[in-house]
């Protein structure tokens, strides 16, 4: 008997189904950074906080005035795990102290990327989050089987080219789906 290799969702989007009850993930679009037999990690990319980069820089360097441009750089709620830890998803033309390459995209977790963005010498495209979404081994697969999520191919234009409130709908539309027309009820033929 042939066994199938597991299918993992690294470098894809997760679209929260309209009936998602968990307030951490209701109406979210999540980029999957890693997914393997040990579990999954993702970053919610459509939920801005009231914080901006200037607020973060004031905490990191209290003796320095952040550049005015940093007031316009939003900070996103990346997920409910380690909400005091920063993650920067960005274009790959720059690398920093703690950078991981993700198939044409990079993820940095060191402060130097924040300072580079503030100084105008950082990556051309970036999204900054505090916290991340984490799933134990088999947990995400179970949630997918329960129809809590849809997955779709990653598209950098959705993260970097659209306003945060447009991202979820655009990801669903890439599958030809209008989320407002979906129901949580499953039928059987």
Curated annotation (Swiss-Prot):
InterPro entries: AlgH-like. Pfam families: DUF179. GO terms for cellular component: cytosol. SUPFAM superfamilies: VC0467-like. Gene3D superfamilies: VC0467-like (3.40.1740.10). Belongs to the UPF0301 (AlgH) family. PANTHER family: UNCHARACTERIZED PROTEIN YQGE, UPF0301 PROTEIN YQGE. This is UPF0301 protein PputW619_0469. It comes from Pseudomonas putida (strain W619).
């Amino acid at each position: 008997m042939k066994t199938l290799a597991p299918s993992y969702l690294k470098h894809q989007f997760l679209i929260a189904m309209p009936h998602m009850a968990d307030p951490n993930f209701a109406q979210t679009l999540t980029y999957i950074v890693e997914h393997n037999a040990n579990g999954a990690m993702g970053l919610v990319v459509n939920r801005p906080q009231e914080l901006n980069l200037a607020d973060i820089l004031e905490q990191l360097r209290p003796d320095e005035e952040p550049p005015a441009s940093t007031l316009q750089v939003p900070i996103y709620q990346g997920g409910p795990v380690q909400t005091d830890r920063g993650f920067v998803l960005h274009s790959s033309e720059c690398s920093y102290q703690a950078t991981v390459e993700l198939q044409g995209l990079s993820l940095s977790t060191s402060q130097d990327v924040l300072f580079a963005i503030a100084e105008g010498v950082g990556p051309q495209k970036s999204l900054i989050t505090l916290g991340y979404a984490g799933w134990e081994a088999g947990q995400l697969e179970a949630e997918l089987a329960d129809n809590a999520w849809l997955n779709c191919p990653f598209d950098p234009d959705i993260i970097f080219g659209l306003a945060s409130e447009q991202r979820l709908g655009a990801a669903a539309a890439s599958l030809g789906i209008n989320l407002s027309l979906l129901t949580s009820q499953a039928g059987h033929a």
